[in-house]
Structure formats: structure tokens, C-alpha cells
Amino acid sequence: MTPTVTVQLTDDTAKRFEGHAKLLAIGTATPTNWVDQATYPDFYFRITNSEHLLEHKEKFRRICNKSKIRKRHLVLTEELLKENPNLCTYNDASLNTRQDILVSEVPKLGKEAAMKAIKEWGRPISEITHLVFCTTSGVDMPGADFQLTKLLGLNSSVKRLMMYQQGCNAGAAMLRLVKGLAENNKGARVLVVCSGITINIFRGPSLEQDDNLLAQCLFGDGSAAMIDGKDPRPGLETPLFELVSSAQTIVPNTDSHLKLHLREMGLTFHCSRAVPSVLAENVEDCLVKAFEPYGISDWNSIFWVFHPGGNAIVDRVEERSGLGPERLRASRDVLSEYGNLTSACVLFILDEMRKKSKKDE
């Protein structure tokens, strides 16, 4: 005889699963140092002692001109590069140098964004119950989450989660993760911090690796933080966005198109030219699966927080999805002003969206 087990939710447990997580505050930060994209090719080839590679320099200039990026903020300065010449070659062993810088700077930049989010939230820092930290810049133990806990003075009992090496996927992954944490832990207030610094991928040019030039043109440094929770307290907390649902999809046979590998020379970047087309050809299937349950099929009727992996990606997705120019405006603006900020990019765009909404009210 097969036993029968009946499970009944108590009133308290049932209430825990009611309602959606809300985004309660956002903060962003960038290094004070920034580079002008129009003149960056001259700086890059000079600082890497590669000015003799005239054709390669002109190729890099064309890539920068087509990027639609106006400027990027970088921790790397000319002084820092002169002090560490092994960062300026293509393949010299330099992982220790990069790690020494990143382990210190990533949590510091994350703190700046976190403090802004906490200030906007307006509640005591002691009410933060969970901390999630994400970066693709360096690896260390104790991790950047532990270092940030000390920098902010969080409770020693805060529940921490450290996520390394998520790349550009991290922004959406953080939203998915924080939704689960906020909705399944009564009274939770989750601080999420994404901090990225490109020292791990900066290197001199290589005649054999053109995708390295794309990496040197595309990525910028920045951090973003958000505070999430369920059941905002009236008069004390102001919800900005509601996290209704989340999903993730793997497109088969695409794992070779975009790869990053940690080596003695740092983090190497390899990107296929097919990436914009692959994304554009598959985005609609993802949209249908996500929005069909809600009866939505007009992609111009929703607001887009689209990670701008690069200008070509934004163009192809906009064209293939039949979007009007305003749908991806916030993504284009963030790309123009900061470059690709990897994990922090989505939160920068959310911040841009809410600022625009306030202006339009």
C-alpha cells in the first residue's frame, strides 16, 4: 500500500509566498578617471608601445568610431600602467599584478554604489538581511562580499552570497536571484552589488587576435547596487519596479561564440562576429515564452532594459524585433556614456529608465 502524504501551508507560510519582490532603491558609481573614445586609439597604442603597428591602429580607430561610445570610465590611468608595464604587453604573465589591484579596488567601487542605494532607500543599514555581490573582475577568498560587509559595517549575521565570473549575464541573473531571496524570506531586504573593473582584460594589441581590439574598445568600469524586498512599508519605502517573473534560456550550439578564459596573462576575450545575428535571431522566442502568459505580443508596448553588449547587437535586435527607436534608447544612452559595464549595465539602465519616467510625469 502506497502511503499518502498531505502537506498544508500554514497561514504564515502561505503569506510568505504572496506578492512579488520590489526594487526599492538603485545606486551607481564610476571611477573619476575617464577616457574620450575619439582619442583613445592614440593613447592605447602609445601606452602599449605599439605605435609602429599603423594598420592595426587604424583598424582600432575604425572599431572605436563605430562603437557609438562617447566615453568610458576606467580605474586604469597612465601612471598605473607605467608602474606596471607587464599590463601593456599582449601575453606577459601579469595575473598577480591584476589580482593585487582588483582585490582592493572592486569592493571599494562597489561600496560607492551601495552607499548611494542605501541613502535613497532611507532605512537603517542594520535592516539589510542579505548581501549578494557579483563581479567578473578577479577572484579571491574571503571574497569581495566579505570585504564589502566590512567596508559598509553590515551586521555580522548578514547572509552573503558571492558570484564570480558571470560576465554580461550577471545583471539579469542578479534580478532573478534577488526575486527568489526577497519572496521566500519574510522581511528580507537584499542588497545586491555588481562591480566591474576592466584591468583584468586590458592588454596590448595582437596581430593574431582582432577580438582583443574589440575588448579594448568596448568595456568600461562601474558599479551598481540595488535594494530589494517584498511588502514595502508605506511611507517608509518607495518601490521603483516590481519583479513579476524571471526566466533564462540556453540557445543550443552557441557556447563557442563568446568565451573568456582566465590565464597567466589575465582574462582573455574571444567574441565571434556571429554574436549579433545569433542574439537577434533568438530573442523573439524568448520574448514569446516570457510574455505569452500575460497576453502580450506587441514588443513596442513594453519597456526594454536590454544589456547593450555592443552597438551592432543593439541594432540587430532592434531591427529584428521591429522596435521603435525609443524602446532601446536607455540602453544606447548607457552604452554611449559608459561603454559595456558587464554585470552593472542592466542596473545602470534601470536607473536611467526610472529617471526618464520621473521627467515624463
UniProtKB/Swiss-Prot annotation:
Keyword Secreted in annotation: no
UniProt enzyme class: transferase
Pathway note: Secondary metabolite biosynthesis; flavonoid biosynthesis
Keywords recorded for this protein, A-Z: Acyltransferase, Flavonoid biosynthesis, Transferase
EC annotation from Swiss-Prot or TrEMBL: 2.3.1.74
Active site: C168
Keyword flag Transferase: yes
A Pfam family this chain is assigned to: Chal_sti_synt_N
UniProt catalytic activity: (E)-4-coumaroyl-CoA + 3 malonyl-CoA + 3 H(+) = 2',4,4',6'-tetrahydroxychalcone + 3 CO2 + 4 CoA
Family annotation (CDD domains): CHS_like
Protein's GO biological process: flavonoid biosynthetic process; polyketide biosynthetic process
InterPro entries: Chalcone/stilbene_synt_C (IPR012328), Chalcone/stilbene_synt_N (IPR001099), Chalcone/stilbene_synthase_AS (IPR018088), Polyketide_synthase_type-III (IPR011141), Thiolase-like (IPR016039)
One GO MF term attached to the UniProt entry: naringenin-chalcone synthase activity
PROSITE patterns: CHALCONE_SYNTH
Taxonomy, superkingdom: Eukaryota
Cited Gene3D superfamilies: 3.40.47.10
Primary role: The primary product of this enzyme is 4,2',4',6'-tetrahydroxychalcone (also termed naringenin-chalcone or chalcone) which can under specific conditions spontaneously isomerize into naringenin.
Family designation: Belongs to the thiolase-like superfamily. Chalcone/stilbene synthases family.
Protein name: Chalcone synthase A
